[in-house]
From Swiss-Prot:
Pfam families, sorted: Creatinase_N, Peptidase_M24
Name of the protein in question: Xaa-Pro dipeptidase
Family: Belongs to the peptidase M24B family.
GO MF terms held by the record: metal ion binding; metallopeptidase activity; proline dipeptidase activity
Cross-referenced PANTHER family: AMINOPEPTIDASE, DIPEPTIDASE YKVY-RELATED
Length: 368
């Protein structure tokens, strides 16, 4: 179905050939994903000919056995891949003048190699915006995978909370989370590098886990996600290890209130900027606006960051079927940081999260 949309777009826009270069986008159109490393892995679609998947011989049998039921063309390391691509295209069609290229995944070296095979062709049309647009709206089968990834994230939080004890490093907690995901859930890939930040480290939103040790009576921020059959989860929770101070409780409750208000307000027809403003106003009115230093959210799907961007000034209208995060944060340098994040799908009834770990402030007991 997705590939039909691409072929229809080619016909409507007077394009002869589509060059799809990102492994994630190839997965979207074919149901097959692999890491080709330095080798060539591409999808070619045509306005009036059958598409084909081009891959290393190492991946040929895997591709043939995948959900992709179209042609697969493999090549050996000893062969010239670009010459073989050109030969395959010229056998399929005489129309290869006008190309639509996924420029977001195109390297200069690959463009030069392709242009050398088709020196008279026009490669100026960008396919990236069309791909981003159709990926905005998730099908029910995609939502099933996103919900499953959310369940895995909820499991990971419980492992992380249980791993906290005096003197444990942030990295050791991460290792426990990722080990148990593999052992108990069969999760072989996280959607990004797992973040665990204790105390003042949590005031640096995207700082990775360090050898910093967890100490009693501080906040600990978790930001984590998994890949489930090619679809990502991404969720954040902040907990207290030991008894938090009144100030810690205050910033937590302000942030939790802002996040829940945005979840409750989200509906089709409002703009991304309006939704961002719901949470931002609450945090600003509480006196912490200067510490909310990022957008409210981002799209999610086959990649952990997709469109739409839920940001101040973005007037894109939110529609049913869009999936995105709602994740306000308050980060006070030298003190603490709080982020609470859920990804979900926008329906006519509102925003439906994929993760369900409680957002009441969890005060964990101190353990030796």
């Amino acid at each position: 179905m997705n590939l039909d949309k691409l072929q229809n777009w080619l016909q409507e826009n007077g394009m002869d050939v589509a060059y799809v270069s990102s492994p994630t986008t190839i997965n979207y159109f074919t149901g097959f994903i692999t890491d080709p490393e330095e080798r060539i892995f591409k999808l070619f679609a045509f306005k009036d000919a059958e598409p084909f998947l081009f891959c290393p011989a190492l991946n040929y049998e895997e591709a043939k056995a995948s959900a992709w039921d179209g042609d697969v063309v493999g090549y050996l390391d000893s062969e010239d891949p670009w010459g073989k691509i050109a030969e395959e295209i010229k056998q399929r069609t005489k129309d290869y003048q006008n190309w639509a290229v996924e420029k977001n995944g195109l390297t200069v070296a690959h463009y030069q190699a392709l242009h050398a095979q088709f020196p008279d062709s026009d490669f100026s049309k960008d396919l990236s915006d069309f791909i981003a647009h159709i990926r905005l709206f998730k099908t029910e089968s995609e939502l099933v995978k996103l919900r499953k990834a959310g369940e895995e994230a909820d499991f990971a939080f419980q492992i992380g909370f249980e791993a906290l004890r005096n003197g444990v490093t942030e990295r050791a907690v991460v290792s426990q989370i990722e080990y148990q995901l593999k052992l108990q859930k069969g999760v072989m890939q996280t959607s990004f590098d797992t973040i665990v930040q204790a105390g003042k480290n949590a005031a640096n939103p995207h700082q990775g886990p360090s050898m910093n040790t967890v100490q009693p009576n501080e906040l600990v921020l978790f930001d984590l996600g998994t890949m489930h059959e090619g679809y990502a989860s991404d969720s954040s929770r902040t907990v207290a290890y030991g008894e938090p101070t009144d100030k810690m409780r205050e910033i937590y409750e302000v942030n939790r209130t802002a996040q829940q208000a945005a979840i409750d307000a989200a509906k089709p027809g409002m703009t991304a900027s309006e939704l961002d403003g719901v949470a931002r106003k609450i945090i600003t009115d509480a006196g912490y606006g200067e510490y909310f230093i990022h957008r409210l959210g981002h799209g999610i799907g086959m990649e952990v960051h997709e469109f739409p961007s839920i940001a101040n000034g973005n007037d894109v209208v939110l529609e049913e079927g869009m999936c995105f995060s709602i994740e306000p944060g308050i980060y006070i340098p030298g003190f603490a940081g709080v982020r609470i994040e859920d990804c979900g799908v926008l329906t006519k009834e509102g925003f439906k999260p994929f993760t369900h770990t409680s957002k009441e402030l969890k005060v964990l007991p101190v353990k030796e």
